[in-house]
Amino acid sequence: MDIPVELRDYSKRRESEEAVANEGNSDDDGNEYLSGLRLTYLFLALILCMLLAVIDLTITATAVPHITDEFHSLNDIGWYASVFFMTVASSQSSWGKIYRYFDLKNMFLLAMGIFELGNVICGAAPTSNALIVGRAITGIGAAGVIAGCFTVAAFAVRPSKRPAFTGGLAATYGVGSSIGPIIGGVLSDRVSWRWCFYINLPIGGFAAIVLFLFFKSPAHSRNEADHRASWREKMLQMDFPGFFCCIAAVTCLLLALLWGGTTKSWNSSDVIGTLVGFFLFTALFAVVEWKSGERAMVVPRIMKQRVVLFGTIGGFFAGGAQFVLVYYVPIYFQAILGTSAQDSGVRNLPYIIGSTITTIVAGTTISATGYFTPLIVGGGALWTVSAGLIYTWSPTTTTGQWIGYQALAGLAVGLCYQPPILAAQALAAPTDVAATSAILLFFQTMGGAFMVSAAQTAFSNGLIHKLVQYSPGTDVQAVIATGLQELRVRYTGAELEAIIQSYMDGLKISFAIIIALTGASTVAGIFMPWKSFKTIQAEKNVENSD
């Protein structure tokens, strides 16, 4: 998982400007920073906030079977992830501007409140639709919490201590997104899937109280010109038209994908209408962004840069592959191998460990050499190979195979997932770093939203088709309505074998989508600049000096 660095980079730029203005006075720059116990409490609160927000990205991956057991909502699996990614991506840029134009402390607490409200709705959801609404609200809050953690750290922590502080937040982001499936599995098996959401309430409440008591918005976090801007200008900066067009377009596509071939035929008026709506809102979004210029969520001027253009294309496919893998591998373990939700999360450890190791290696390599494209292309090629190996999984796959193939995939992901953002940041103008980071994050997260839904549609259609073929007398809708944990209780013998094989064939289609996505991401990476970013920067400096 890559770290949403939009506001952290913006803050770093502000730090650089402040350092110049104060002629290198470093910590003694006249600004107010926290220290002692207040700083310790703030660090604890921000770590907890970050951990809760990023765990929510993947915690439902292993909780899904228990959710489907209760709601009999196999067709909604794609929504539980996609709607969360959709709102995180769409609101990321808006939160960055909210922190810029309004009081930092109050807006961070507002983000926490929205995040907690969404989790209350999820935990108490009486229906699958209510859970989906809760996930959407939670995503909006999570985007603000993640961005806010880095922003608060940048303004509240003394410059000499800031690298270690933000490094702790970054490490928390990586760990949290990786352990989400494990925590989701443990809570679902031992307590209830609802505690995947309720657990956020006491911990998040404690963190919010600590922030309220021990943190106040530093004076230097307020840019008076921004805060004095008219309400009209502040609202224009939020790019609400772009936000709503984006949400509408994605919602239309998700509805079409989740309806098509399962609850409605592909040629039904509802499916066709939502597809038409997707294209119309996408076109409208493009027009709005073009007209909005520098106020846009996706700034057209920045998108024209080669590293950004192909970074977003590759990032979209890579984000899709990443989240399809995270969400559908646990289904393989539970439906095909019959493991519990907890065990399916633990069986993801080879992937988690592999990706953690090579993410560190990739970052170190790029910092030392400046070369990023070889990692993107090489890692992408290795990821495609590992996806092909995962495609070969079956009900008789050995332990060594599922461990080895996942470990290989994790090693590959770590090499190629983060570098496009690092490269785009390194080559962007200082004033464009934040916007560039936000654009790449937007497309990576949207890739997850789209492709998890596409994989769900492919999986459901494949399951239905094969079940009719393997076991004509089985009630297809009854199987779909049966949760994964109930399959081996409700069905036995040859009928159960047919159902498991049908699940396997459906999963293979989802795994094939991962192969296509990783391959497309690798091809996009080929068109990234092959020079070291240090060389490119030096060439730009020479041009500017001339």
UniProtKB/Swiss-Prot annotation:
Pfam families with a match to the protein in the record: MFS_1
Presence of keyword DNA-binding: no
CDD domains per UniProt: MFS_Azr1_MDR_like
Main location: membrane
Keyword Cell membrane: yes
CC annotations in GO: plasma membrane
Keywords: Cell membrane, Glycoprotein, Membrane, Transmembrane, Transmembrane helix, Transport
Subcellular location: Cell membrane
GO molecular function: transmembrane transporter activity
Glycosites: 267
Bilayer-crossing regions: 39-59, 77-96, 107-127, 137-157, 167-187, 195-215, 240-260, 270-290, 307-327, 349-369, 370-390, 402-422, 433-453, 509-529
Membrane topology of the entry: Multi-pass membrane protein
Protein's pathway: Secondary metabolite biosynthesis
Source organism superkingdom: Eukaryota
Inducing stimuli: The expression of the dibenzodioxocinones biosynthesis cluster is positively regulated by the transcription factor dibT.
PANTHER family: MAJOR FACILITATOR SUPERFAMILY, MAJOR FACILITATOR SUPERFAMILY (MFS) PROFILE DOMAIN-CONTAINING PROTEIN-RELATED
Function according to Swiss-Prot or TrEMBL: MFS-type transporter; part of the gene cluster that mediates the biosynthesis of dibenzodioxocinones such as pestalotiollide B, a novel class of inhibitors against cholesterol ester transfer protein (CEPT). essential for dibenzodioxocinones biosynthesis and may be involved in the secretion of the cluster products.
Family statement: Belongs to the major facilitator superfamily.
Name of this chain's protein: MFS-type transporter GME11371
Source organism per UniProt: Pestalotiopsis microspora
